[in-house]
A protein has these predicted regions:
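N-terminal Sec-pathway targeting helices
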Residues: 2-20
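Boundary/entry segment of secreted carbohydrate-active catalytic domains
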Residues: 31-86, 90-92
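Aromatic-lined substrate-binding rim segments of carbohydrate-active enzymes
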Residues: 72-130, 143-145, 200, 204
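An active-site-proximal structural segment forming one wall of the substrate-binding cleft
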Residues: 105-121, 139-166, 185-199
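Active-site groove signature of glycoside hydrolases
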Residues: 124-134, 153-186
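Catalytic-core regions of glycoside hydrolase
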Residues: 166-323
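Catalytic cores of secreted or luminal carbohydrate-active enzymes
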Residues: 300-360
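Extracellular/luminal regions of secreted and cell-surface proteins that mediate adhesion/ECM remodeling
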Residues: 344-470
Length: 470
């Protein structure tokens, strides 16, 4: 009997020991260290940010088959100070209207894209046959020849997907703007766009001149959703370029006079309905172009409102000078804003595309949290890599990836980022906390609109003190 009691005592002791060890393992992190996080002030900045894929672009034109190429960026201009961000390249194929592009012409195209790739720019690319409003005279005499040119140019373009961000149009129309062409029937437009999508890399965005052209090509008014966006399909790639932006009530022929409905998607809708369409669509595909014709629609307050609804991420820096100069002469007025007193042009420049403001950072137990707001007109259509880094006072570096799809950081909304940190495994001491956003395609760091100090680890957002209690 005594033996049984003794065995029972041993068993009870063993079970209690297991419970104690389990509690120790479960509560150890909470019980044997203390973490104190001190955030840096999240002060918003009104500075211009040199971030990719967005902003006012400069335009450069090239004629394939010409004796020489001019306007190529010099190798010495590739440093950050001289580098242009987003640029538009118009490549004229009129010398080969009725024949295949020569090897020499394709080599010239390669030279052009290679130069801008080395320059570190992001390219909006438009192929065309006309710069003088005479497309019907200079375009190929057969649709098959245009399709062949798409095949040939795509072989070169696909080598530069880290440089070519999007392509505008389907090669036809005056200045490549999909108008006054032999090939603007619904059938031809659909054939050309589907073929262009087939031969170009899925990472390159495509775009058409008007919303109704997109609806006709896809035979649908459906917009991408979070489930279908960025899946490589034509619908997920096909955005808009509007070179009549804010020019008239119908954006100089971009919109129509039909009310939106399920039965009228093949018609151009009235302005308000087309703006609502773009407000949904262009959260997932790019929209840009150029403003034109000084009028009340592009007065500063109205322009900001519509550019925001259309989610515009890029605009021509040279056209229309009357409108751009009007914005430069106007002041943005909002006493509660860091942009109060800035010129209208500068305000718009700082809101084209995405603009991330870190609102606050915090540590809840071992969960580190970052809250940021996209105050720009659009999302970033390329997914970013996100990283939190702790650097100890003696230089040890601990980096942790953050899981969040930045392509869904919709304008006007706040993104909540969270990551669990292994604080119990860190030595006691002081750590500087850094946050970094990087575009993996360009290997470019994305700058937040804050006044944080910066070094190679990213932006310093706070200090973490860890002390051990044993």
């Amino acid at each position: 009997m005594k033996t049984n009691k003794k065995s029972f005592s041993y068993l009870l002791f063993f079970l209690l020991l297991l419970v104690f060890l389990a509690l120790f393992a479960f509560l150890g992190i909470r019980s044997f260290y203390r973490a104190n996080y001190m955030p840096e002030p999240c002060t918003e900045s009104a500075d211009e940010l040199s971030n990719p894929y967005i902003g006012f672009y400069h335009m450069y034109g090239y004629v394939l088959g010409s004796d020489s190429l001019s306007n190529l960026p010099a190798a010495s201009d590739s440093d950050a100070k001289n580098r242009q961000g987003i640029v538009m390249l118009e490549v004229n194929l009129q010398n080969f209207s009725n024949e295949d592009l020569s090897d020499s012409a394709l080599s010239q195209l390669d030279t052009i894209l290679s130069a801008w790739q080395r320059h570190g720019s992001q390219v909006i690319l438009r192929f065309l046959y006309d710069w003088d409003g005479k497309a019907m005279e200079t375009e190929p005499q057969s649709l098959e020849q245009i399709l062949r040119h798409m095949d040939q140019t795509a072989e070169v373009v696909n080598r530069y997907t880290d440089c070519v961000f999007l392509m505008q149009g389907i090669f036809v129309g005056n200045c490549g703007e999909m108008n006054n062409s032999h090939y603007m029937s619904d059938e031809d437009c659909t054939t050309l766009m589907h073929h262009l999508a087939e031969v170009t890399d899925p990472s390159v965005f495509l775009s058409v001149r008007t919303p109704v052209q997109r609806r006709k090509i896809l035979d649908s008014s459906e917009r991408p959703t979070k489930e279908t966006a960025f899946d490589g399909s034509l619908s997920s790639r096909l955005g808009l370029f509007n070179d009549g932006m804010l020019g008239t009530a119908n954006d100089t022929g971009t919109y129509g006079d039909t009310a939106a409905s399920a039965d009228t998607y093949r018609s151009a809708w009235v302005r308000e309905d087309e703006l609502s369409f773009q407000n949904e669509l262009c959260n997932f595909v790019p929209n840009g172009g150029e403003v034109t014709l000084d009028n009340p629609l592009n007065d500063l307050a109205h322009a900001i409102q519509d550019l925001s609804r259309m989610h515009v991420s890029y605009l021509n820096s040279e056209h229309d000078p009357a409108v751009l100069d009007k914005w430069k002469a106007a002041a943005y007025k909002d006493k509660a804003s860091v942009f109060n007193g800035l010129s209208g042009y500068d305000y718009i420049e700082r809101h084209l595309g995405y603009r991330y403001v870190i609102q606050d950072t915090a540590l809840d137990s071992s969960d580190f949290q970052i809250r940021l707001e996209n105050v720009g007109f659009s999302v970033c259509y390329r997914k970013l890599d996100l990283q939190l880094t702790l650097v100890s006072s003696d230089g040890e570096v601990f980096s942790f990836p953050i899981s969040s799809d930045s392509r869904f950081w919709i304008p006007g909304t706040t993104a909540e980022l969270s990551i669990s940190l292994p604080l119990a495994r860190l030595a006691k001491g002081s750590y500087t906390v850094y946050f970094q956003m990087t575009d993996p395609v360009l290997q470019r760091e994305i700058l937040p609109a804050n006044t944080f100090s910066h070094d190679t680890h990213g932006f310093s957002i706070g200090t973490l003190e860890i002390s051990k209690l044993y």
